[in-house]
Design a protein with these regions (language model features):
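C-terminal lid/capping helical subdomain adjacent to the catalytic/cofactor pocket in oxidative enzymes
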Residues: 3, 16, 374-433
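Conserved Rossmann-like nucleotide-cofactor binding loop
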Residues: 13, 38, 229
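Predominantly flavin-linked oxidoreductase catalytic cores and closely associated redox partners
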Residues: 154-263
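Conserved FAD-binding subdomain of flavin-dependent enzymes
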Residues: 20, 29, 35-91, 96-106
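N-terminal Rossmann-like FAD-binding beta1-loop-alpha1 element of flavoenzymes
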Residues: 3-31
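Active-site substrate-recognition segment that forms the wall
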Residues: 19-20, 45-51, 84-87, 221-390
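Flavin (FAD/FMN) cofactor-binding and adjacent substrate-gating region
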Residues: 77-78, 83-180, 185-196
């Protein structure tokens, strides 16, 4: 008989975990719980969707390689190009001037922090003949485009559509979804060896309304995949614990736009990822996607307050959006009349499709937590069943790599929970408080 399993947080990590758990246990014993009235309304749905195979340091390298290969395999098996825009990608670092190239950090440095991968040597390209250079990027005299990825080591997805696919598959198998709903308390029973975890009380919600219903979900296995809210969820359920789950948030504004210079006729050569710098003091990142869209972001802040998860989609800040729109116009707008001169300021043919603000879960040490919490850290004498029959687990803090690491995390976490040998060594991601 499958151990009842509750997953708190139905973002990309939660639905990936449910997807792989349901391959090896009765799907009806898996319960997904999420407080947002609109699923995937934060980092899972508003991320860039950039995938990398080998941009990671030793602790993350095995998980990165596993996840990258699983993204490829899943897309190949389920028509990922059509269903969620999976495509190989070519990555570049871009400097608009020689001065910017010499004085500024590379635009991809923040992504490479802690990696053991050596910087790629600069390569010169003939834009007219390469076929894999981004024709949608505005080029100016004196700029520099540097290849920073090896062929076959980076890719692109639309994260919202990937999340929706995984959730559809879970529900079709029989996984249960409760949303909007939030955890209220754990339920225990003394079987003679301490107060054993046997369930979670959840409060079912209606958007903007008070509590409408309380429900007990029986479980002996509890998984917290609540992104930036993971620490809050743990504290709600285990207020007596001395353990703090140190997940904080990194807020990021983003745009999804259309450009007449990126269209279906160009998608056969794959998508692009471009990292650059901007004189506004931030590092724009832009990713072309299958379907004619370009994702533009890079304006991040660790000081924006984390909203209540049950309020759903966060409201972007007008000033930040205006700054992004101007940077997008400067970087992606039409070229001028020739000679590599930029177009006039009022000449903008970019169409804004979506604007967003999301909150990425991060740790101070730059690596996610994927671990079972020891019973002694839970406190109050609460115990969980041994081995694959029980446990409290946490998976969060993936930072800018949540989508890239999602499938590998789902595989490994499902294996940990079910007592199977893990497909990647994630011992370096354990957490001991």
């Amino acid at each position: 008989m499958s151990a009842e399993t509750v997953i708190l947080g139905a973002g990309i990590i939660g639905v990936s975990t449910a997807y792989y758990l349901s391959q090896h246990q009765d799907p009806s014993s898996i319960h997904l719980v999420d407080p947002s009235p609109e699923l995937f309304s934060s980092a899972s749905g508003y991320a860039g969707g950039f995938l990398a195979k080998d941009w990671f340091g030793p602790a993350l390298a095995p998980l990165g390689a596993l996840s990258f290969e699983e993204h490829r395999r899943l897309a190949e098996e389920h028509g990922g190009r059509e269903k969620w825009g999976y495509s190989p990608a070519t990555c570049f670092s871009y400097a608009a001037s020689a001065a910017a190239r010499e004085s500024a950090k590379r635009g991809d440095d923040w992504l490479r922090d802690g990696t053991s991968r050596a910087d790629a040597a600069p390569l010169a390209f003939d834009d007219a003949g390469s076929g894999k250079t981004p024709t949608w990027l505005r080029r100016v005299d004196g700029d520099h485009l540097e290849l920073i990825s090896d062929e076959g080591t980076t890719a692109q997805v639309d994260p919202l559509r990937l999340c929706q696919f995984l959730l559809r598959e879970c529900l079709a198998r029989g996984v249960k979804l409760y949303h909007p709903a939030k955890p209220a308390s754990v339920v225990t029973h003394d079987f003679g060896n301490g107060d054993e975890l046997i369930g979670v009380n959840i409060d079912r919600l209606e958007a903007g309304e008070p509590l409408t219903e309380s429900l007990l979900l029986p479980c002996t296995r509890l998984i917290i995949t609540a992104g930036s809210w993971t620490g809050q969820v743990f504290r709600t359920l285990f207020p007596w614990s001395r353990l703090e789950i140190p997940i904080r948030s990194l807020a990021g504004h983003s745009l999804v736009l259309k450009s007449p210079r990126w269209h279906a006729g160009l998608e056969g050569n794959g998508c692009h990822a471009i990292f650059t710098t901007h004189d506004g003091g931030f590092c724009p990142e832009m990713f072309s996607r299958i379907g004619g869209h370009i994702y533009f972001a890079g304006l991040n802040s660790s000081s924006l307050p984390l909203p209540d998860a049950e309020k759903g989609k966060a409201t972007p800040y007008d000033e930040s959006l205006a700054q992004l729109r101007e940077a997008a116009r400067q970087t992606l707008g039409p070229a001028g009349g020739g000679g590599g001169v930029a177009a006039a300021d009022d000449d903008n043919d970019l169409e804004i499709v979506r604007e967003g603000l999301c909150f990425r879960p991060v740790t101070d040490w730059g690596k996610p937590i994927i671990a079972r919490i020891p019973d002694e850290e839970i406190g109050a004498g609460i115990v969980t069943r041994a081995g694959a029959n029980g446990g409290v687990f946490v998976a969060a803090g993936h930072g800018p790599w949540g989508i890239a690491m999602s499938l590998g995390t789902g595989i490994v976490l499902a294996e940990m929970v079910q007592g199977r040998k893990t497909s990647a060594n994630v011992s370096g991601l354990a957490f001991f408080g």
